[in-house]
Swiss-Prot record:
The chain crosses the membrane at residues 4-24. Disruption phenotype: Knockout mice are resistant to Western diet-induced hepatic steatosis due to impaired cholic acid synthesis and deficient fat absorption. It is a single-pass membrane protein. It comes from Mus musculus (Mouse). One of its GO terms (cellular component) is endoplasmic reticulum membrane. The gene is Cyp8b1. GO terms for biological process: bile acid biosynthetic process; positive regulation of intestinal cholesterol absorption; steroid biosynthetic process. InterPro entries: Cyt_P450 (IPR001128), Cyt_P450_CYP7A1-type (IPR024204), Cyt_P450_E_grp-IV (IPR002403), Cyt_P450_sf (IPR036396), Cytochrome_CYP8B1 (IPR030686). Induction: By cholestyramine treatment. Induced upon starvation. Heme binds at residue 439. Keywords: Endoplasmic reticulum, Heme, Iron, Lipid biosynthesis, Lipid metabolism, Membrane, Metal-binding, Microsome, Monooxygenase, Oxidoreductase, Phosphoprotein, Steroid biosynthesis, Transmembrane, Transmembrane helix. It catalyses: 7alpha-hydroxycholest-4-en-3-one + reduced [NADPH--hemoprotein reductase] + O2 = 7alpha,12alpha-dihydroxycholest-4-en-3-one + oxidized [NADPH--hemoprotein reductase] + H2O + H(+); 5beta-cholestane-3alpha,7alpha-diol + reduced [NADPH--hemoprotein reductase] + O2 = 5beta-cholestane-3alpha,7alpha,12alpha-triol + oxidized [NADPH--hemoprotein reductase] + H2O + H(+); chenodeoxycholate + reduced [NADPH--hemoprotein reductase] + O2 = cholate + oxidized [NADPH--hemoprotein reductase] + H2O + H(+). This is 7-alpha-hydroxycholest-4-en-3-one 12-alpha-hydroxylase. Belongs to the cytochrome P450 family.
């Protein structure tokens, strides 16, 4: 009994010292401004989670371009000067680490235990199968899946041109998810069954997506924790390696990565969790992004006209083959500078990722101004490009306005020259992240979104139920989690054009 009391006392002493050191943390010389908030340990957590954008905007106004805040017992140093991003992103000294944070996150969210080399493996697989010839093959598979999802297994009657009504966000998310899921995970012999399965999986995916932000922050209620666990198990089962064996057409990209895991001796149950992670990574942002793209086009008829003219010039006349397949040449995606600018501008306005690095050893942050700051080991360095880059009026004049030609030069080529304080800036748009955390699947994601938008432009008539409805604000719960989502749905009408 005496021994246990001694051990317990020692543990309490250690924990007490740790807590005391956190509570008594103060700013040292050469460190950034420190703002711990008024609530011990929690710090600014509640304000940050309530509206990350407004919180960081207020902190920048108070402290400047570099500041450290306490969030749930952890200290985050936010850097708001994009001219100073380079050393953080390149990180040649390896003092800043991305993978340790990423491994913790995927274990918590998807149940996947990362192994040595799998981050490099994902990038190798993406380079081989999501670029060049591999990308062209996957683009064709995505086109076939979009034809199946949008026209049905029996094809669409050319006379069926009556208007249908739906929520634009739901429509885009559902179509892109189902087509993406089928393109990556393959088909059975029963196409209608495949569509029904994808539809059911989409409903579960949306529920998980709804809970996701609070899940990451550990803010779920008891029943929601149970529900999340049930959803995780469902996806592990429905995306299992065993079930995939019954399907044809699994993507070479996914097959390559699963082969690597098998060669590493990874259990099939862990491969199932890897599949869930890949489904989320590939389908969590494309549908929401396309919602914003179509909404901006509907609200800006000059942009719609420019994209239509480009689509007609590049693609020719729209036709349906055997009434159930879109006639579309995926290679044409390389020749759409206007649509490329529309996509980049939409992503500038709707993509809100947070880039995090864990400080592995005491680190000197060197700013473009020449100022240097000491960052402590164990802290996190964070970038929030939506506020510091995308909404900077010096880089992007009228930053809150949608300008479809913002990323076009007068001669119609892509614009890449942007400036801040008179200096050319490299990081002028960061919807995909940057450095080691840059999305490896961005080329395929962009291709599938462009394909969907072009199909809607060429083959469908669509309009808003209320043409005067304003663009909805971003749901504040989604700040920092990839592509933002609207605070409310927008109703629209659509119908298949009478094509031959």
């Amino acid at each position: 009994m005496t021994l246990w009391c001694t051990v317990l006392g020692a543990l309490l002493t250690v924990v007490g010292c740790l807590c005391l050191s956190l509570l008594l943390r103060h700013r040292r010389p050469w460190e950034p401004p420190l703002d711990k908030g008024f609530v011990p340990w929690l710090g600014h957590s509640m304000a940050f989670r309530k509206n990350m954008f407004e919180f960081l905007k207020g902190m920048r106004a108070k402290h400047g371009d570099v500041f450290t805040v306490q969030l749930g017992g952890q200290y985050f140093t936010f850097v708001m000067d994009p001219l100073s991003f380079g050393p953080i992103i390149k990180n040649t000294e390896k003092a800043l680490d991305f993978q340790s944070y990423a491994k913790e996150l995927v274990l918590k969210v998807f149940g996947y235990q990362s192994v040595d080399g799998d981050h490099r493996m994902i990038h190798l697989a993406s380079t081989k199968h999501l670029m060049g010839q591999g990308l062209e093959e996957l683009n064709q598979a995505m086109l076939d899946s979009l034809s199946l999802v949008m026209l049905g297994p029996k094809g669409s009657s050319l006379g069926a041109s009556s208007w249908c009504e739906d929520g634009l966000f739901h429509f885009c998310y559902r179509i892109l998810f189902k087509a993406g899921f089928l393109s990556l995970f393959g088909y059975t012999k029963d196409k209608q069954q495949d569509l029904d399965e994808a539809d059911e999986l989409f409903r579960k995916f949306r529920r998980f997506d709804f809970l996701f932000p609070r899940f990451v922050y550990s803010l779920l209620g008891p029943r929601e924790w149970v529900e999340v666990s049930q959803l995780q198990r469902l996806f592990h089962q429905r995306l299992s390696v065993e079930q995939n064996l019954e399907k044809d057409g699994i993507s070479c990209w996914l097959g390559y990565m699963l082969q690597f895991l098998r060669e590493q001796g990874i259990a099939s149950s862990m491969q199932d969790k890897f599949n869930f992670m890949m489904l989320w990574a590939s389908q969590g942002n494309t549908g929401p992004t396309c919602f914003w793209v179509l909404l901006f086009l509907l609200k800006h008829q000059d942009a719609m006209k420019a994209v239509r003219e480009e689509a007609t010039r590049v693609m020719g006349k729209a036709r349906l083959e055997a009434k159930k397949s879109f006639t579309f040449t995926p290679s044409a995606l390389k020749h759409t500078p206007v649509l490329d600018s529309v996509m980049e501008e939409s992503l500038r306005l709707c993509a809100t990722p947070t880039l995090l690095r864990v400080v592995q050893e005491d680190y000197v942050l060197k700013m473009a101004s020449g100022q240097e700051y000491q960052i402590r080991r164990g802290d996190k360095v964070a970038l929030f490009p939506y506020l510091s880059v995308h909404m900077d009026p010096d880089i992007h004049p009228e930053p809150t306005a949608f300008k479809y030609d913002r990323f076009l030069n007068p001669d119609g080529t892509r614009k890449v020259d942007f400036y801040k304080s008179g200096k050319k800036i490299h990081h002028y748009s960061m919807p995909w992240g940057s450095g080691v955390s840059k999305c490896p699947g961005r080329f395929f994601a962009l291709s599938e979104m462009k394909t969907f938008v072009l199909l809607m432009i060429m083959y469908f008539d669509f309009k808003l139920v209320d043409p005067d409805i304003p663009v909805p604000p971003i749901d504040p719960r989604r700040w920092g989690f990839g592509t933002s989502q609207p605070s409310h749905e927008v109703r629209f009408l659509y119908r298949l054009k009478p094509v031959q």
